[in-house]
Each structure stands twice: as C-alpha cells, then as structure tokens.
C-alpha cells in the first residue's frame, strides 16, 4: 500500500493507494482518531451491484451504517439527489459526529462531498473512489452539484478526512472508463511534469496496463495535484492550472448532453484545443501534431461534432465560472510540463476555436 499526505491551508489528510485495501476500510477509518457515530454510505448503483453488500458488511461490523444508492452517471449530481440524500441523513438521525462515505466515481464523490459540506454545516466525509477518473476529483476538496444552466455551479471547497483508493476495483472498469480517467493523468503531466509526460508518451495503448503501472500513474497524478492544492486550496492562483482542457471540455459535455460523451473524452478534446492555443498565443514550442495524434491513437476523439456550432461553444465557455469582466481565464502551456494562464475575450476565443476546428477537419 502506498500512502501520501495532502496538505492544504485548512487541513491535512492521508491518501491510501493499493490493491484490496477496501477490506481495510474500518481499520483505516479508526486510525484517523475521529469521533464517529454513524456512517451514511453513498454508493453508485453499479458499484453497489458489485461491492455494495461487502462494503456494508465490513463497515457495519463497527458502526451503524445506512446505504444510499445513487444513479450512475452525471444525472446523480442534481439538486433532487442532493435533497434525497439529506432527507435520508435526517431520517437516519445523523449528528455532527457522523460521516458520509462516497463509494463510486467522481460524480458520487462530488455529490456526497457537497452533502457532507452542508449537512449540519459540515460533517466528515471519506472518498473511496472506484474509477481512474476519480483519482483527480477525490483529492482537492472541490464538491458540487450541477444546475440546468451549467456544470458544478452549486458547490463548495470541502476536504475529505481521507481517501481510500482500492486499485483492485479498476479491473472491472470498461476500456471507455479507463480512457476517461487517463485523460486527467495526462493533464497532470502536461501542466506540471515533463518527465512524466515523456514516460506516458511511450504508451501507444491503454489496454493491458499492469497493476504496477496503474498504481504508479495514480500516485504520480495525485502527487502533482496535491502539490498544487497545497499552494492554492481555493483556486485563487495556480490551482486554476488544473483546468487545462476543461474550459472547452465542459462546454462539449454540456452540448453533447451529460452522459453522451465521457468527461475524459471531452477533456481530451479540450486539451487538443488548449495545445493549439498554447502554440498560437503562448508560443509554446512543441510538436503539437504529434501530441494530438498520440491522443487520438489512445482512442480519444479528434474533433467535435460538426452539428455543434462554434458560437454556441464559445458562449458556453464564456459562461464558465472563471470568466471575469467579459474575459475568460484560459489555461495554456508555457512549455511542456509548465502551465500559465491567459485572458481571452469571446471574439478571440471564437476565432481560435474556428481556426482549430477547420484545421482538425481538413
């Protein structure tokens, strides 16, 4: 089992990574030395089918546990599900020494974390991610639900008390979900670690990754994010660099319809555009075409659906929470392994997006 500490201005907590460590969950929770009266286990429906009974039994040997099953997919991050979970918590007579555990992917973690942040003005919560994508979202304390007008518009910064990452659970992931999660690993390399990026570039497929390779990628990705969050917990500075690929990525997700394209595929499209902007605006020296072809070779899409018009996408991007005074903060690369931001107007963004889309479909 690997262990690292995430330290922020407001808290510090352990991240445990290893195969089969879900079976040690009760012992790991006890080692935190937190008062714990009850557990609300918030679990993804598909994860519940595979591991729900086992996890309930393991925890229920030590504490009273109530299981709440949430839908798989982005639709779970709704105000309706948020209210349902809070109702379950109240009916279970949870108090301020109770705990919520998120057992699922990033969606489950976002939802459970926001519920914990707001129940009785904040109770403990634990992240138990079950997807590769969640290696990113489980660390750093961003929790939220969606609004019909945009993703993650209702949320908070609220750190978990621990992250328990059982990599054995990744073995049941379909290739599409593995690829989705790998996009965030690649993002971390692009913005913060050239040597790690060079290592990733040696992989021409995501099939057949060994447990050791996955564990190392997860550890490296979380280490990079932890270092960023340590310096900037609430996205007032360099934490914004973690949004590399996400400005367009979130717009693509919204226009395709949540669940119609994976988060990772959308972010990969966003990174391809961000590489183009890095070249055009930040004068980043790189072999962009080669990097783009590598991403496509791993199975990521190389262009956005033609029926989605550029002005619609640029309007979505300008509605991003990083927009200030008619300018949106866009993350680019100064060089491979080092990020910076730039401010773009709607016209500049639209012009760059038009040129990139014409190039990608040429």
Swiss-Prot record:
Chain positions recorded as Zn(2+) binding sites: 184, 246, 263
Single GO cellular component term: cytoplasm
Catalyses which reaction(s): 7-phospho-2-dehydro-3-deoxy-D-arabino-heptonate = 3-dehydroquinate + phosphate
UniProt-listed GO biological process terms: amino acid biosynthetic process; aromatic amino acid family biosynthetic process; chorismate biosynthetic process
Compartments, record wording: Cytoplasm
Free-text function comment from the UniProt entry: Catalyzes the conversion of 3-deoxy-D-arabino-heptulosonate 7-phosphate (DAHP) to dehydroquinate (DHQ).
Family to which this protein belongs: Belongs to the sugar phosphate cyclases superfamily. Dehydroquinate synthase family.
Protein name, UniProt field: 3-dehydroquinate synthase
Lineage of the species this protein comes from: Bacteria, Bacillati, Bacillota, Bacilli, Bacillales
This protein's encoding gene: aroB
């Amino acid at each position: 089992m690997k262990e690292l500490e995430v330290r922020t201005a407001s808290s510090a907590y352990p991240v445990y990574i290893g195969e089969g460590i879900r079976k040690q969950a009760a012992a790991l929770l006890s080692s935190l030395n937190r008062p714990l009266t009850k557990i609300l286990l918030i679990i993804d429906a598909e994860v519940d089918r595979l591991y729900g009974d086992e996890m309930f039994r393991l925890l229920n040997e030590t504490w009273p546990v109530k299981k709440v099953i949430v839908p798989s997919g982005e639709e779970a991050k709704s105000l309706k599900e948020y209210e349902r979970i809070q109702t379950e918590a109240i009916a279970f007579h949870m108090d301020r020494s109770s705990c919520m555990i998120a057992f699922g992917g990033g969606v489950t973690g976002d939802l459970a974390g926001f519920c914990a942040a707001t129940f009785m003005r904040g109770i403990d919560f634990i992240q138990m991610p079950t997807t590769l994508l969640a290696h990113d979202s489980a660390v750093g304390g961003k929790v939220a639900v969606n609004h019909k007008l945009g993703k993650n518009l209702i949320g908070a910064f609220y750190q978990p008390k621990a992250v328990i990452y059982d990599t054995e659970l990744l073995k049941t992931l379909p290739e599409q979900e593995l690829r989705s999660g790998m996009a965030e690993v690649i993002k971390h390399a692009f913005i913060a670690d050239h040597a790690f990026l060079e290592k990733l570039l040696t992989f021409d497929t995501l099939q057949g990754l060994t447990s050791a390779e996955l564990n190392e990628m997860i550890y490296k990705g979380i280490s990079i994010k932890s270092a960023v969050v340590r310096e900037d917990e609430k996205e007032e500075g360099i934490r914004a660099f973690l949004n590399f690929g996400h400005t367009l990525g979130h717009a693509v997700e919204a226009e395709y319809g949540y669940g119609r394209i994976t988060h990772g595929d959308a972010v990969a499209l966003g990174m391809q555009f961000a590489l183009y902007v890095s070249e055009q605006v930040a004068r980043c020296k790189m072999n962009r075409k080669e990097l783009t072809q590598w991403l496509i070779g791993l199975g990521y899409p190389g262009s956005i659906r033609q029926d989605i018009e550029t002005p619609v996408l640029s309007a979505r991007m300008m509605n991003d929470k990083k927009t200030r005074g008619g300018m949106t903060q866009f993350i680019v690369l100064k060089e491979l392994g080092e990020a910076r931001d730039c401010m773009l107007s709607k016209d500049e963004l639209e012009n760059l997006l038009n040129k990139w889309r014409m190039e990608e479909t040429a």
